[in-house]
Design a protein with these regions (language model features):
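Conserved beta-strand elements of the Class I
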Residues: 110-113, 206
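Ligand-binding loop in jelly-roll beta-barrel domains
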Residues: 58-64, 104-108, 134
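A short, basic/flexible loop-to-alpha-helix module at the beginning of a structural domain
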Residues: 94-107
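Histidine-anchored nucleotide/phosphate-binding helix
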Residues: 119-131
């Protein structure tokens, strides 16, 4: 079913990513980790549809937050990140998805691993945990190119500072802050072993990002002893489409 959302607020996350909040009057509610299809239609009738993860907590009362990273060759993301304005209307379909989700009744340790914009659905999980008052312990391993590429920086910092049940580890692949304890580079088996929950605690692991990132991270998790049936993945293709 297609819904119409009105843009309520906009903010830049990075130089190439923007978050927008939509007011959707007939929104049925969603679960953290789900996504929506967004449809843009040109005056000549041509339409383009892209899928984007929902960033807002499950208890969002008719407001849906989406964060989009601009792709230079994209059809939809340049408009959403550069031209969309408060008061504009967007068509969206959803919520979609039932596997890559976190539900508030889950009490086991949760391991989140994000690559770049793959943080978006994981942020919905973190926010849903907070809004529900859940005591489930969360760990987030967030891989980004450089500090300037971090989404939700201030909110993540505040959450990890004020909630002992949420911990955050950054992995910078190109440029790290001065005196950072780890050289820039991709995540590897050692980092996964050090940052993730021990397998004997039975964590559920959620991994989201580009296809190659997700495949590597999932392989490292399995090699470290994590149960394959406790690893849930969401992949983005070369164009940013979900798989």
């Amino acid at each position: 079913m297609w819904h119409v959302g009105k843009v309520f607020a906009l903010r830049d996350e990075t130089a190439t990513a923007r978050t927008f909040t939509l007011e959707v009057g007939d929104w049925p509610g969603h679960v953290a980790g789900q996504h929506v299809d967004v449809r843009l239609t040109a005056p000549d009738g041509y339409s383009a549809v892209r899928s984007y993860s929902i960033a807002s907590a499950a208890r969002s009362e008719g407001r849906v937050e989406i964060t989009v990273e601009r792709l230079p060759s994209g059809e939809v993301s340049p408009y959403l990140t550069q031209e969309l304005a408060v008061g504009d209307r967007l068509e969206l379909r959803g919520p979609i998805g039932g596997w890559f989700v976190w539900r508030t009744h889950q009490t086991e340790p949760i391991q989140l691993i994000a690559g770049g914009s793959g943080i978006v659905p994981l942020m919905a999980m973190i926010r849903s945990r907070a809004s529900a008052g859940s005591a489930a312990p969360f760990r987030l391993l967030y891989s980004v190119r450089e500090p300037a590429a971090v989404f939700y920086r201030d909110e993540l910092q505040a959450l990890t500072n004020n909630d002992e049940g949420v911990s955050l580890t950054y992995a910078y692949t190109r440029v790290a802050p001065k005196d950072w304890p780890r050289r820039p580079g991709r995540i590897d088996a050692a980092l996964i072993t050090n940052a993730a929950w021990p397998s004997n605690l039975g964590p559920t692991c959620y991994v989201c990002g580009p296809t190659s990132f997700v495949e590597s991270a999932a392989a490292f998790l399995i090699a470290s002893g994590q149960s394959p049936d406790k690893i849930r993945t969401e992949r983005f293709g070369p164009t940013g489409d979900r798989k």
